[in-house]
């Protein structure tokens, strides 16, 4: 076949409708005794049959959930300590709960922060991001 005849063939194929292309595919499969389906890839079975474990998050957020009225001053001091906020901002953080005290922090820092808040009388928790 010459380059010219190949270009003509490509042009004709480009003008076929989806239905015509489907029929052409079937005819070629029959003529050449092949299938145009994607090959199936076999996946090796795992040894234990256990589900894959999700990767543990590396960043955490600490949430201040509740502060009893009689513990507010102690919690306020801890919030200032762990966030570095001024008194006014720390006070606002302890009102209208729940509020995120820290974001994108390590697990050990999140655990320490929650422990300090709980020791001061607040209800706090952390979760992975």
Swiss-Prot record:
Gene Ontology molecular function: any one: structural constituent of ribosome
CDD domains according to UniProt: Ribosomal_L7_L12
Biological process terms in GO annotation: translation
Pfam families reported in the protein's UniProt record: Ribosomal_L12, Ribosomal_L12_N
Keyword Ribonucleoprotein found: yes
Domain of life assignment: Bacteria
InterPro entries: Ribosomal_bL12 (IPR000206), Ribosomal_bL12_C (IPR013823), Ribosomal_bL12_C/ClpS-like (IPR014719), Ribosomal_bL12_oligo (IPR008932), Ribosomal_bL12_oligo_N_sf (IPR036235)
Span list, region Disordered: 94-113
GO cellular component: cytosolic large ribosomal subunit
Keywords noted in UniProt: Ribonucleoprotein, Ribosomal protein
Subunit structure: Homodimer. Part of the ribosomal stalk of the 50S ribosomal subunit. Forms a multimeric L10(L12)X complex, where L10 forms an elongated spine to which 2 to 4 L12 dimers bind in a sequential fashion. Binds GTP-bound translation factors.
Function text: Forms part of the ribosomal stalk which helps the ribosome interact with GTP-bound translation factors. Is thus essential for accurate translation.
Similarity-based family: Belongs to the bacterial ribosomal protein bL12 family.
HAMAP family, per the entry: Ribosomal_bL12
Listed name of the protein: Large ribosomal subunit protein bL12
């Amino acid at each position: 076949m010459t380059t010219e005849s190949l270009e003509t063939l490509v042009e004709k194929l480009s003008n076929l409708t989806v239905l015509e292309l489907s029929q052409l595919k079937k005819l070629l499969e029959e003529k050449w005794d092949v299938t145009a389906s994607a090959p199936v890839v076999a996946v090796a079975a795992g040894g234990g049959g256990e589900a894959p474990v999700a990767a543990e998050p590396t960043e955490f957020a600490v949430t201040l959930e509740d502060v009893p009225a009689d513990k507010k001053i102690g919690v306020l001091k801890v919030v200032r300590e762990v966030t570095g906020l001024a008194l006014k901002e720390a006070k606002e953080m302890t009102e209208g709960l729940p509020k995120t005290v820290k974001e994108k922090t390590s697990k050990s820092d999140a655990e320490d922060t929650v422990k300090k808040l709980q020791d001061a009388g607040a209800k706090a928790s952390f979760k992975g991001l």
